[in-house]
């Protein structure tokens, strides 16, 4: 599927002003004057008065939960893929944080692979720290 987004206020990450984009599958195929294509296979979306930004990168995400500094009651739950997508995040770097007792590298790696399978790009930093 090819999607043509027209009249969007585009940031990439610098402001490009109002412009058009072509998206082929999950990739930006063309931007600006090169984003001119029509036909039966092209879906057009009018983004007038809307902002168009690339997927954001969260470089420190507690994808298997965070917290724990205040004991077991202060732990937080795992990240859901919808939480990332609704925030515009398409790439994550998962970390353990302070809790390497109840959260493990195996869990972190498994969650990163699961998020990859759900459509996000996910990496891991290994190790943790104690407070």
Could you describe each region identified by the protein language model?
Residues 47-110:
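Metal-associated gating/positioning segment near the N- to mid-region
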Residues 36-39, 64-71, 128-129:
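Short, mixed-charge, low-aromatic patches
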Residues 96-131:
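Histidine/acidic-residue-rich, glycine-tolerant segments that coordinate divalent metal ions
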Residues 5, 43-45, 57, 93, ...:
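Hydrophobic/aromatic beta-strand patches that form the interior of the parallel beta-sheet core
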């Amino acid at each position: 599927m090819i999607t043509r987004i027209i009249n969007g206020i585009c940031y990439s990450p610098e402001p490009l002003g109002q412009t058009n984009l072509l998206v082929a599958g999950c990739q930006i195929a063309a931007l600006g004057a090169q984003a001119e294509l029509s036909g039966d296979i092209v879906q057009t979306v009018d983004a007038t008065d809307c902002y168009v930004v690339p997927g954001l990168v969260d470089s420190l995400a507690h994808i298997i939960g965070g917290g724990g500094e205040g004991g077991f009651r202060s732990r937080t739950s795992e990240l859901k893929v919808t939480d990332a997508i609704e925030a515009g995040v398409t790439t994550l770097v998962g970390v353990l944080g302070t809790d390497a007792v109840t959260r493990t590298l195996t869990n972190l790696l498994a969650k990163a692979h699961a998020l990859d399978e759900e459509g996000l790009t996910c990496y891991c930093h290994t190790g943790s720290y104690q407070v």
